[in-house]
């Protein structure tokens, strides 16, 4: 079976997003397009042409409700599956992925954990009520984020800073693998949950990134707008402009042609004939 083209990957991911959107609407769960997908919605009214995945974010209370819903309705959601470390012990990330199991994904340099074509779901937690508090808070899990990345890698790679730094990196890699990704994911999640999303002025996906530019004012996320994305409409934060400028700067100007490449480095192919037939038709349903 042939690998999916970029456009076929986008079509498949869009179908997954439509399923997720239906669940969130039915259950009254807050979510919105995020990161590069949000740029795509504003700048291209769909995918960034060279992007190869979809990102959404959810306040932690809604994220928890989605996880509970997907576990309760596991059988009827098939072939869709929500991936977390508690649902799949081989899973290696503190975010969730809503995955179509009729496909198989193979990352370059990442351990195989049975992922299908997917949509990333980023849980948003509180970061504090002042800029100083939020900046300090978001830095705290940096070590655990690095350990999680060690657990996700399919093999050790020497330090890019030279051979003198490689032994220390190898020791950290071995220590992380000894404990396993679940240990660090549970620890970083317990840390992130200490600050209540609903009570903090600043929020962000602190289990995923430790940079200040991914921390936002909660008021920017409180209201959502529905905007065109490909052949459907999905919610985005009403404060999207300030958010995107905070993270990306001039997000409305595309990068130069030589930088217009996907960032995730994976291949996808259908495991089932039905999935393959969908892409032969070339239709977004």
Predicted regions mapped to residue ranges:
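Conserved catalytic core of two-metal-ion nucleotidyltransferases
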Residues: 1-25, 70-129, 148-249, 253-285
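Active-site nucleotide-donor binding segment shared across nucleotidyl transfer reactions
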Residues: 21-54, 58-64, 219, 246-247
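Charge-rich, low-complexity amphipathic helices
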Residues: 45-47, 60, 143-144, 265-273
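Conserved SAM-binding loop
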Residues: 66-68
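A short secondary-structure junction signal
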Residues: 131-136
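Short, His- and charge-rich active-site/binding loops that engage polyanionic ligands
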Residues: 138-141
